[in-house]
From Swiss-Prot:
Residues 127-138 have a biased composition (Low complexity). Component of some E3 complex at least composed of sina, ebi and phyl, required for the degradation of ttk. It comes from Drosophila melanogaster (Fruit fly). One of its GO terms (molecular function) is zinc ion binding. Keywords: Cell cycle, Coiled coil, Notch signaling pathway, Nucleus, Sensory transduction, Ubl conjugation pathway, Vision. It comes from the Eukaryota. This is Protein phyllopod.
Length: 400
């Protein structure tokens, strides 16, 4: 649809906005919804696939209004999608509904029907089939076939007999060496010759004795010999399969914590465990070069970091130095009272003992009450601050 037709269809819009302005020429894309002046009407006749049918096949709806537009990118995307569908389904280029394209396709089909291409193909196919049919019909001399076949058989049999003769020679010679006294009792005469020859042409003649009970005795001895050193092997192989714990943190994670101001250190093992297991006392370091197999079974995701809290992570935080307890409060109060008493005794050396006692007891009561209140407030604040931190076992935070 041209701009003149659009102005006739919408005369009010044409009057309101100037004809040369770009805002008037901007249209909304049916697929992506962008507002641009580079649009194409979907009902315009064109060569290639029908855009309306492509929209219906891809998005399962058919635009009924003629004032529907597509931007250039969506138009190209639809055409590319259609070509990919045609390639995947082994089809030719799609036929549009335009009369020119339809006429061209009909003419091409008629031309292909008129071409006498199929008349030549059967002659080419018949020729190779006639050649192998003539080959079995030609008779070949039947007499040499069994002769060649018999020679091959004889050669194969002679090869097999030679192999068997070698095996029997070795077995019989060993048996003759091991049991010379029992030749007369259990003797076996073996004569090997190729088939179809005289008796004089024998390959070998071996007289041997078949040992019946010796293999069983050998097996018993072998089993006893293999059974005795098994505990020695087990005792030697136990330290080889000893597995040390996996380094808890990767080197990259350690470097990351160092840049953030966090230092990682492993806690020293207990003395009794080191004495009991001297081999296990020395654990591998965190950044250990030994890359052993992981002990955990589940594979870690990309955004997961495994932290085993058998190490101490010390961080510098601006909070209280230590946790306040009731016993420490009592000890601090007693020390402060003793210091105050000593100072007051030095000031009032010239006074009598009764006056010193009265003067020392009077200021002690409000100060002790005041200091007790301050210590309770400090301990309460510290407990409130530390109550929010739920630390796992093995994690210690040193507060400075």
């Amino acid at each position: 649809m041209s701009t003149n037709q659009q102005q006739q269809a919408n005369p009010s819009a044409a009057v309101a906005a100037p004809a040369a302005s770009s805002e008037y020429l901007k249209r909304t894309c049916l697929i992506c919804g962008c507002h641009t002046n580079q649009t194409i009407n979907i009902y315009e006749p064109r060569s290639g696939p029908n855009i309306v049918q492509l929209i219906q096949a891809k998005f399962k709806f058919q635009p009924l209004n003629e004032d529907k537009f597509l931007c250039f990118s969506c138009n190209n995307w639809l055409i590319n999608w259609h070509s990919l569908q045609a390639v995947n389904s082994n089809e030719a280029e799609s036929q549009s509904q335009s009369p020119s394209h339809m006429g061209n396709s009909v003419l091409q089909q008629e031309r292909t029907k008129l071409r006498p291409v199929a008349m030549v193909r059967p002659t080419v196919r018949v020729q190779p089939q006639s050649q192998p049919q003539l080959q079995p019909q030609v008779p070949i001399n039947p007499t040499p076939a069994p002769i060649v076949y018999s020679k091959r058989r004889a050669s194969r049999r002679s090869a097999s007999v030679s192999r068997m003769s070698r095996v029997l020679r070795q077995c019989c010679v060993e048996s003759l060496r091991r049991s010379p006294k029992k030749r007369n009792q259990q003797s076996v005469f073996v004569c090997l010759r190729p088939q179809g020859q005289k008796r004089s042409n024998a390959i070998c003649k071996v007289e041997c004795v078949a040992p019946r009970r010796k293999p069983v005795e050998r097996l018993v001895k072998d089993v006893a010999a293999t059974a005795t050193p098994t505990p020695v092997l087990n005792t030697q192989s136990t330290p080889t399969y000893q597995r040390f714990p996996q380094p808890s943190v990767d080197g990259k994670v350690v470097a990351m914590f160092r840049r953030l101001g966090t230092t990682l250190s492993r806690e020293e093992p207990a003395a009794y465990s080191a004495e009991s297991n001297p081999a296990c006392s020395k654990l591998p370091q965190i950044m250990s070069p030994l890359k052993e197999a992981p002990r955990w079974t589940r594979d870690l995701d990309d955004d997961e970091i495994l932290l085993e809290f058998d190490t101490a992570i010390s961080e510098v935080l601006p909070t209280a130095r230590y946790q306040v307890t009731h016993e420490e409060n009592k000890e601090n109060q007693q020390a402060q009272e003793m210091e105050l008493e000593l100072e007051e005794e030095e000031e009032v050396d010239g006074r009598a003992e009764l006056e010193v006692v009265q003067e020392a007891e009077a200021p002690l009561e409000p100060q002790s009450h005041h200091k007790q209140g301050n210590s309770h407030q400090n301990s309460h604040q510290a407990s409130i601050q530390l109550a929010g931190l739920r630390l796992p076992m093995g994690l210690s935070i040193s507060l400075v």
